[in-house]
A protein has these predicted regions:
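Glycine-rich phosphate-binding loops of nucleotide-dependent enzymes
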Residues: 1-180
């Protein structure tokens, strides 16, 4: 994981990889410290690294978790844990962001926050976003290019509208249209 981060690749997976006994802020702070090259010492932060705390709080604000900054991660809902993982991913500032089903397990009101975050990252145009997703509405909302695999084989690659018109994609993922 550390080598991947040094190479500029960050990922947020379906199963969260967090420190459940630390607070929300502490989890993001560790990512900020790692990115800044300060290391992982929890004590070093409290001895004058206020800019690290401010940076961590910035990422919490981006994912709408500021009100939960002092909560232990283990007490968060799955959706909030997913948002926290996105905050950590952003704090690592990778060149490539990989999202595996970024909205899986989230409530209906939590999904727009993460989708908007991914839209913002894409709008900045300085990072590559790779998205693994089975919900076609999410794919259509976020993708500039879609690559579809079916049974381990590449079946489509192109712009969203083109891929969505593909007969094999429709049969495999969208269902065969009902005859009129």
């Amino acid at each position: 994981p550390a080598r991947r981060a040094r190479l500029g690749v960050g990922r947020a997976l379906q199963l969260t990889n967090l420190f459940p006994h630390l607070t929300v802020l502490e989890n993001v702070r560790l990512a900020v410290q790692s990115r800044a090259g300060i290391g992982m010492s929890m004590l070093s932060l409290w001895s004058g690294h206020t800019e690290v705390i401010q940076r961590a709080e910035h990422y919490l604000e981006r994912v709408a978790l500021t009100p939960k900054r002092g909560a232990l991660v283990g007490t968060l809902s799955h959706g909030d844990q997913r948002k926290l993982e996105v905050a950590i991913l952003l704090a690592l500032e990778p060149a490539i962001l990989m999202f595996d089903e970024p909205t899986a397990g989230m409530s209906v009101d939590e999904v727009p926050v993460v989708l908007e975050l991914i839209h913002q990252v894409k709008a900045e145009r300085d990072k590559t976003v790779l998205l693994v997703e089975h919900k076609m509405d999410v794919v259509r909302a976020l993708a500039d290019r879609i690559i579809v695999l079916h049974n381990g084989a590449l079946v489509a690659d192109g712009e969203p509208a083109e891929v969505m018109r593909s007969k094999i994609v429709q049969e495999a993922y969208l269902g065969t249209p009902e005859p009129a």
